[in-house]
């Protein structure tokens, strides 16, 4: 039972050392201190992820794992673009209720379905204290059995699912068909019940396989924050067919049809550089979403930059490209990769950020051989460059001129 006294205890001790708090449990008769410690751990996990929830004193997090698996404020707000005010949305994998909360915030009426009783109770409480309970109906049910349990439910405008990507022992899984619920098996039922279906899947998933498994896919959205891929969203429509052009959206502001990359790849010779860039030129590193999308040759074509090598996903140009979807750098010097250059590299760069793309050394091996400390304002890229006389390994020394979110 979640009581006001228990919540007060949790919030009072939110900054405490948890092992010490548990050891001092005898000082707090009438309080399940171990349960409180788990709640505190869960709240700490949403402090940066869901600051509005963390700041609301009545919010409860049943277990740390539910906080780890839930959407963030960033991804929750992103999903609001799929919502039209007044529409009915079924969230069939309710969990902590973050996505239901943001759907309701966008003006949707939401049915939250979740098989775990503890999560349903927590969601009811959280929706109430967050001021959205009037827009969300909570039902304890699995996605698979919802319509058997409630056969007269009205037809939703959209169904949302975030299949569990963990096994019973809490280890991660990446195969879409191994997730629960199995959206591959359910896809026909889902599209029969709703004209639009939105599915959140692992950022490790293979996009081409997604399209094969879910042929009604119309759009794929790749969400990244701080240059790390966080989520992939698959948007399906009932009327979509296997021949439909599928658009991939990469944040920020870069989208393309899948066949565009195929056409650009067919023209790869024109997009590959054939020389070593020189100081004063610009180096471009695609953002995490672009890298995940696989739009390697289309990026070169669309932004009029040259690709270092077929397998080196870095680009360069002699002119600045201010809207490049990633990070931009000015090239300060270019060094051939050799034992001699490695030995003297730390003389010029005692501290630097290192990255490798299609390079003989890993970053760890590079640091070990040069003793270059991590950090600073210099960025060194080890990569393979296609030149007029063949492929060569080079170290491109740069300074950053722009940082995309």
Question: What spans do the regions from the language model cover?
Answer:
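SAM-dependent transferase fold signal centered on methyltransferase-like domains
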Residues: 1-405
